[in-house]
Amino acid sequence: MSDMKAIHFGGGNIGRGFVAEFLHKSGYEVVFVDVMDAIINALQQNKSYTVTEVGTSETKSKTIDNYRAINSKTDEDKVVEEIATADIVTCAVGPNILKFIAPVIAKGIENRKKDSPIAVIACENAIGATDTLRKFIEEKLSDSTKSNIQDKARFANSAIDRIVPMQDENAGLNVKIEKFYEWCVESKPFLPSQPPKIEGVHFVEDLTPFIERKLFTVNTGHATAAYYGYNRGKECIHDVLQDKELNEIVRNTLKETAHLIVNKHEISEEDQNQYVEKIIKRISNPVLKDNVERVGRAPLRKLSRNERFIGPAAHLAEMGAKYDALLGGIEMCLRFQNVEGDDESFELAKILKENSSSDATEKITGLERNHTLFPAVEEVVKKVQA
């Protein structure tokens, strides 16, 4: 029985296959928290599951055990109790769900039984996700806890990078995941103490370069391939990148984001080019069998203001630099409509149908109407609406 305990919100593939695997390897007992009955029941009924790394000629499997699972919908008090005595809280629930998990975390922080502050790390594909979570948590805290928050909790942003492809149909809890990973966490929030011990985590003073480089290279590249692939009738990401024309489009998009990353952060052109090549190699991997519809899902989130398309395009527009390839990706994403199993794609179609081009542009992207980028994106919206 471990004396270190981590609470992880989100029993999905990233939670089980990446975050929990690292926590488990570092000696923590992991307590999964979710609202999905099926996931919680499966975790409660099975004492272990397997994480298999794929993506090279060899595959490597690891067994994950020493965990428990709680349904926060039916057992909130139990979750509060666990957080009160835990060392770490992590989550991989999707940026839109942070506001729903915040109240129970706030109660756990209010009831802290440990002298040391709990580490709170959101593992989401979004810039400043832990800051967002902290804001929601603090709205629920008493004034006295809020004024002594440093004694109760330390909040650190993180950047995670690991591709979880489509899973085999009857995989159950077992997760197939790519071999490559990167998990960077801010170190400053833990000062003057040491950051928590999590094997494989890279603690950095300034997370912004890592998070933007990852979001505007991996996520922008992956999404560009997915939306072009979807609109050209391709099945998997590796099929898209085998197409000479589409491969070139993805590369041109990443040239634009590289220009931004090199100019904004202290990253050399050579380093960024090597990073781009590594990313293209990763997402081209046929072993991952990564479906374009899976990668493309949630187009509204992916078209939002600070996300993988509008985020870099807005920066480039402000710099007076080129962003034509990104506009192409934005168009393809806008055409990802009414895709079975993806609510946002239906919502996107509805917005485009029911609004003028300027209203639709503002609603979908969150861009200010007076922003340099707005007219160019509105033209793309008009084209898609036509």
Curated annotation (Swiss-Prot):
Biotech application, in the record's words, is: Liamocins have high bioactivity against the pathogenic bacteria Streptococcus spp. and can be potential new specific inhibitors of oral streptococcal biofilms without affecting normal oral microflora. Liamocins are also able to inhibit human cancer cell lines such as breast cancer cell lines T47D and SK-BR3 or the cervical cancer cell line HeLa.
Q: Which Pfam families match?
A: Mannitol_dh (PF01232), Mannitol_dh_C (PF08125)
For binding NAD(+), which residues are annotated in this chain's numbering? A6, I7, H8, F9, G10, G11, G12, N13, I14, G15, R16, G17
What InterPro entries does this protein map onto? Answer: 6-PGluconate_DH-like_C_sf (IPR008927), 6PGD_dom2 (IPR013328), Mannitol_1_phos_5_DH (IPR023028), Mannitol_DH (IPR000669), Mannitol_DH_C (IPR013118), Mannitol_DH_N (IPR013131), NAD(P)-bd_dom_sf (IPR036291)
MF-aspect GO terms: mannitol-1-phosphate 5-dehydrogenase activity
Q: Which reaction does it catalyse?
A: D-mannitol 1-phosphate + NAD(+) = beta-D-fructose 6-phosphate + NADH + H(+)
* Alphabetized UniProt keyword annotations: NAD, Oxidoreductase
List the record's Gene Ontology CC terms alphabetically: cytosol
Upregulation details from the record are:
Expression is regulated by the cAMP-PKA and HOG1 signaling pathways via the transcriptional activator MSN2.
Q: Enumerate the Gene Ontology biological process terms.
A: mannitol catabolic process
Documented EC number(s): 1.1.1.17
Phenotype upon gene inactivation: Affects the ability to produce liamocins with a mannitol headgroup.
Enzyme superclass (EC): oxidoreductase
Xref: Gene3D superfamilies: N-(1-d-carboxylethyl)-l-norvaline Dehydrogenase, domain 2, NAD(P)-binding Rossmann-like Domain
Q: Please name the catalytic residues of this protein.
A: K214
Assembly mode: Monomer.
Extract the NCBIfam families matched here: PRK02318.1-3 (NF002647), PRK02318.2-5 (NF002652)
Similarity-based family: Belongs to the mannitol dehydrogenase family.
The task this protein performs is described as: Catalyzes the NAD(H)-dependent interconversion of D-fructose 6-phosphate and D-mannitol 1-phosphate in the mannitol metabolic pathway. Plays a key role in liamocins biosynthesis by providing the mannitol moity that is linked to 3,5-dihydroxydecanoic acid (provided by the HR-PKS PKS1) via ester bond formation catalyzed by the esterase EST1.
Q: What is this protein called?
A: Mannitol-1-phosphate 5-dehydrogenase
